[in-house]
Each structure stands twice: as C-alpha cells, then as structure tokens.
C-alpha cells in the first residue's frame, strides 16, 4: 500500500484554501458581460480561448496534492451546476470561494464548524424560497431570446436562434447543436424522433470526442423480443452488410453471444452497427416501436404478427437520413416513412388523447405525438476557424440548457441583483446558537460577492459604491455592467433562469460546508525518482568499446 501524507486542523484547511483560491481566481475573471477570456494550452493543436467558467475549472490540475484537493472540490461545484442548469458555473464558483473564505475566518476565531454548517444550510433554504417568490414565468419569444443571449455571453444572435428553434418545435421539442460545414450559423428543422435509450455498449461509439455513435443513411431493424441467439440475427446482418449501409438495431435487449459477436465485428470494421434497447415498457413499448416503424417506413418484426427474425429481409427494415446515439438517448432524423402513414398515425394518437381518462396516459400520448410531429431543430454553428467554432458551439449548448431551465422554473433579475434581493429571506432563518447565527451571516456576505465580481471585471467602477446603491434600490433596479448604467435590468434584458441561480447557491454552499467541516486531509506521498547514472560511452569496461 502506498504511504500517505496527512495534514490536520488549520494546516489542512489553509492548504485547501490555497487550491480553492487558485481555481476560483482563474474562473471568476470570466463573470459578467465585462468578463475576460482565459487561454488554455492544449497538448495538440491551437490553444483554446474560453469565457465559460466550467471549461476553465475542468482544465485545472495543481501540482501540490493538498491544494489540488481544494481545487477539485470547487471544480465539482462548477460541473454539478453546469450539469443541472447549463449556466451559472462562474457564479457558483464565486459563491463557494466566498462562503469558504468567510467560514474559515470564523473557524479560526473559535466557531464550531458543524454549527456554521447548520446555519449555512438554514440560510440557503430561506434564500432559495425567496428566489422562488421573486421568480416570474416566461412564455414569449422575446423573453426566451433574452435568456439565451445572457447565457451565451451576451450574444444576441445565439439568443434569437434558440428562441426561433423553441418557437418551431415547442419548448419540449428536441433541439440539437452541430458544427456547420461553412461560416454561417443557421437553424434547420428536420422531421425526427428522440427516445431515452442509449447504446448497449460503448464500443459502438464512432465519435470519441462526443462519445456518440453517428450512423449516416442507416437501415433500422425493429424487433420486439430479446436477441440472445446469433443464428437468428445472422441472415439480416449479412444482408445489411451487403447493402453497404450502417445498421441500427432496436430490440428489447441483446444478450451474451449475440452482443459480443456484433461488438467484435464492429471493432474489426466488418459491420457498421449500433444496438439500443426499445423504449418504454409493455403495451407502451409496442406502440412506440410501431411509431418508429411508421416514421422510418419499416416493419416491427413481431412473432405476434407472424414475422420471424431469421426470415427478415431488407424490405422489413426502416430507413433514416441520420441516427445519433449517445449513452442516454437515440435521435432518428429524416425518417423515410410515408407522409400519409405518419399523418394517419398522428391522428390516431390524437383520438386516443381525447378518449384518455388518465393524466399519466395523456401525458405519455402527448409525448409520442410531439416525437412524431414536432421534429428536431438542428442549430448548425459556423465560424471562421475551428477554435472559434468549438468555443461558439459550447456557448450555444450552455445557452440552450439555461433557456430550458428558464422555461421550467422561470427567471429572476440578472446581474447578481436577484441574490441581493433574496437576502431579505434570511430574516426568516432561525438560529439555535451564536455559531449558527454566524453561519447565516456568512451567507448574507457571500450573496453580495457575484455583484462585486461583475463590477470588478468592468475595471472602471468601485464595487462597494455599486453594491450600496443596488441595495438601496428595489425590485429589478440594478447595475448593468455592459452599459455601466443603473436601470431596470429586466427591461434591459438582463435576466437569469431561477434554476441557474438556485443551483449555483445550493451547490456552492454544499461543497463549502464540506470543506469547512474538514479536519484532516490525506494524500499519497510523492515518490522521489532516483537519478540513474548514465552509462559511459564506448560500452562496458573490458569489452573493447563493444556496441
């Protein structure tokens, strides 16, 4: 077992703080409309330029293992916030740093860490409730565009593009982001369907960067039973291989020998194939497989209908323009089914919706309807260089995620002002002792930090002056860092999704509390590399310079 290095008490917390500060200081320069870019060196290719907090956080790995632990804990704040809400990663990092910094001061002064944590937890609960109280729902295209613009680092073109996409396929419709062949960024709506089943094996992946399996112009086998015997599957595999087109297999499951054989042939390059489980369960699964068959112009191979897998021919297979499969979802784009058949199926489902007496059944039927009729909106992102395209694509994906969050939970005033307005929720927080009261005050101070940092990044205005003026105001009044004017921020389009602000605070408080209550830190002892003496030239002694 490797030897361990252990630090205790204030020594451990001090080292962790150095790591927290190093990461947070690199991330927080990107906050707000006046935030700066961070340049990240890559082992291969050109450096990456980004203004996305989580991208910066993910690149940071420190040489000191204790400092690195602190940095990785805060990186978790940014990653979790990005996963849940799509934006707010820099805000979350700034909040985590502020809570930890203020908490450490009080721990050093003799406060009990566990009571500080309880106070912080109670304070966060009340602030989150206050954020919900001041949140407002969004519906209009203009409001959706505003959220998209802010989340895409104040790029109105991206905001408008996302609003158009949501307008065309609905707020719950499927929207994907792809790299364009040229320089133009455009929206394209294509008929398609997405269901929540990913690939059965990561060996099916064709794009290792995105971990997707991408099949162009594939054939689609739709089978309603498990496939465990390779003999059943072999005839149709041979026929699809002869056609030269990739194959998507949708079945209840593929087990053992059959899956292993498919994977081996995929790795050898004999087959271009991907396998996924069928969506849904029971009767709903049968209906969804039928939907896929109608959309792609295929036939569900079902023994109930008298079809057997070993007798299947190419004519039974569905077809599509493209299929993308990740670990969680399968998206079928440009199904080659007949327009009349698809329309008839849509009308049939609409009839079932009208007759349905169960809310759950109605919801599931409407989901199927959206998948058949809503289509997929594809945002093709163009740019002059690959570096710019990757950065822009990442911003669009973040903005799309954040816009969906805004549709779910509504919006609050942006620019760090919502957290200032939510401070009044702390008046409801009840403390059992002085240390818990201190925990509540730590949150009161930390909630001011995002606004201070937004102002600091402008480089022209005193943060303390702005903070006092914003505190003196009410409602949507705040400081617009883009124009450096005091105004109604909602009317100026400066808004944040409530979910983003809430997630940032909850995740920051969670990780900062763990760090505050840490009493020991353990890492592996670094092994010293021994310097081997170089062999003298001319071979070994007595060997006459043999080489």
UniProtKB/Swiss-Prot annotation:
SUPFAM superfamilies (UniProt xref): GroEL apical domain-like, GroEL equatorial domain-like, GroEL-intermediate domain like
State the species of origin.
Pelodictyon phaeoclathratiforme (strain DSM 5477 / BU-1)
Could you identify this protein by its name? Answer: Chaperonin GroEL
What are the protein's UniProt keywords? ATP-binding, Chaperone, Cytoplasm, Isomerase, Nucleotide-binding
What Gene Ontology cellular component terms go with this record?
Answer: cytoplasm
- Which pairs are disulfide-linked? none
**Predominant place of localization:** cytoplasm
Q: So what family is this one in? A: Belongs to the chaperonin (HSP60) family.
Give one GO biological process term: protein refolding
Compartments it resides in? Cytoplasm
Its biological purpose is as follows: Together with its co-chaperonin GroES, plays an essential role in assisting protein folding. The GroEL-GroES system forms a nano-cage that allows encapsulation of the non-native substrate proteins and provides a physical environment optimized to promote and accelerate protein folding.
Kindly give the InterPro entries that the UniProt entry links to this protein.
Chaperonin_Cpn60_CS (IPR018370), Cpn60/GroEL (IPR001844), Cpn60/GroEL/TCP-1 (IPR002423), GroEL-like_apical_dom_sf (IPR027409), GROEL-like_equatorial_sf (IPR027413), TCP-1-like_intermed_sf (IPR027410)
EC id:
5.6.1.7
Q: Name one GO molecular function term.
A: unfolded protein binding
Lineage: superkingdom = Bacteria
């Amino acid at each position: 077992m490797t030897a361990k290095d252990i630090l205790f008490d204030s020594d451990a917390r001090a080292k962790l703080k150095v790591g927290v500060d190093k990461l947070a200081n690199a991330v927080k320069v990107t906050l707000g409309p006046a935030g700066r870019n961070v340049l990240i060196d890559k082992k291969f290719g050109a450096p990456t330029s980004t203004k996305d907090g989580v991208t910066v956080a993910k690149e940071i790995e420190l040489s000191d293992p204790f400092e690195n632990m602190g940095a990785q804990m805060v990186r978790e704040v940014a990653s979790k916030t990005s996963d849940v809400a799509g934006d707010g990663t820099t805000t979350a990092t700034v909040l985590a740093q502020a809570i930890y910094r203020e908490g450490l001061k009080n721990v050093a002064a003799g406060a009990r860490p566990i009571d500080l944590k309880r106070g912080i937890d109670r304070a966060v609960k009340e602030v989150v409730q206050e954020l919900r109280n001041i949140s407002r729902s969004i519906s209009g295209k203009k409001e959706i565009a505003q959220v998209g613009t802010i989340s895409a680092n104040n790029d109105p073109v991206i905001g408008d593009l996302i609003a158009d996409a949501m307008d065309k396929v609905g707020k719950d419709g499927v929207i994907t982001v792809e790299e364009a062949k040229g320089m133009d960024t455009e929206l394209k709506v294509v008929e398609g369907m997405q269901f929540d089943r990913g690939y059965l094996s990561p060996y099916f992946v064709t794009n290792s960067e995105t971990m997707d399996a991408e099949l162009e112009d594939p054939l689609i086998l739709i089978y309603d039973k498990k496939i465990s015997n390779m003999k059943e599957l072999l005839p149709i595999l041979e026929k699809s291989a002869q056609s030269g087109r990739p194959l998507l297999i949708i079945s209840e499951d593929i087990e053992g020998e059959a899956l292993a054989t498919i994977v081996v042939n995929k790795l050898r390059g004999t087959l271009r194939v991907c396998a996924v489980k069928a969506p849904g369960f029971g009767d709903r699964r049968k209906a969804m497989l039928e939907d896929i068959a109608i959309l792609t112009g295929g036939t569900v191979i079902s023994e109930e209908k008298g079809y057997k897998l070993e007798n299947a021919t190419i004519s039974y297979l569905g077809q599509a323009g493209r299929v993308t499969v990740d670990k969680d979802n399968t998206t079928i784009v440009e199904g080659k089914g007949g327009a009349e058949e698809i329309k008839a199926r849509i009308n049939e489902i609409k009839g079932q919706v009208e007759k349905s007496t169960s809310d759950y059944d109605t919801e599931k039927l409407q989901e199927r309807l959206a998948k058949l009729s809503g289509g997929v909106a594809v945002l093709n992102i163009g740019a002059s260089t690959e570096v710019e395209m990757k950065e822009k694509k990442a911003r669009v994906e973040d903005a799309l995620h954040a816009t969906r969050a805004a549709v779910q939970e509504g919006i609050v005033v942006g620019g760090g002002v919502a957290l200032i307005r939510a401070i009044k929720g702390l008046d409801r927080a009840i403390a059992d002792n002085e240390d818990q009261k201190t925990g509540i005050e730590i949150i009161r101070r930390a909630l001011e930090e995002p606004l201070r940092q937004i102002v600091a990044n402008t480089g022209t205005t005193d943060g303390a002056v702005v903070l006092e003026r914003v505190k003196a105001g009410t409602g949507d009044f705040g400081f617009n860092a883009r124009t450096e004017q005091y105004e109604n921020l909602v009317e100026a389009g400066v808004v944040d999704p409530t979910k983003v602000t809430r997630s940032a605070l909850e995740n920051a408080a969670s990780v900062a509390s763990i760090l505050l209550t840490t009493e020991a830190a353990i890492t592996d002892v670094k092994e010293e590399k021994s310097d081997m003496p170089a062999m003298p030239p001319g071979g070994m002694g007595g060997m006459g310079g043999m080489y």
